[in-house]
């Protein structure tokens, strides 16, 4: 009996983890298109906190900044390269170009979920150097 309950819990956790992965990708896709406010309404928990050092930690401040960036960069492209999801955490490694012809930046977003909502978000990014000795690249 314990095995059956464990299997059912594991399947439910796997389903929620996959849902979290899909939400994280949709959140970033919407934000890149200038729909960060909508993404926050859809997916952020009421007590959402982000850890980007350039903005206040609340959802509204981050959404304002993300939407402003999308307006300033209407040709912005976000391409998800890979994701890692385990339990309440989802990591998205993406390439981002703000303008056509720009070098891509490697950006990693780390999401923490509670009850199917994004409750915490971290992000780090680095522009791909034009002259790098690493022939494997950043992606």
Regions found by a protein language model. Give the residues of each.
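C-terminal and inter-domain tail/linker signature
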Residues: 1-139
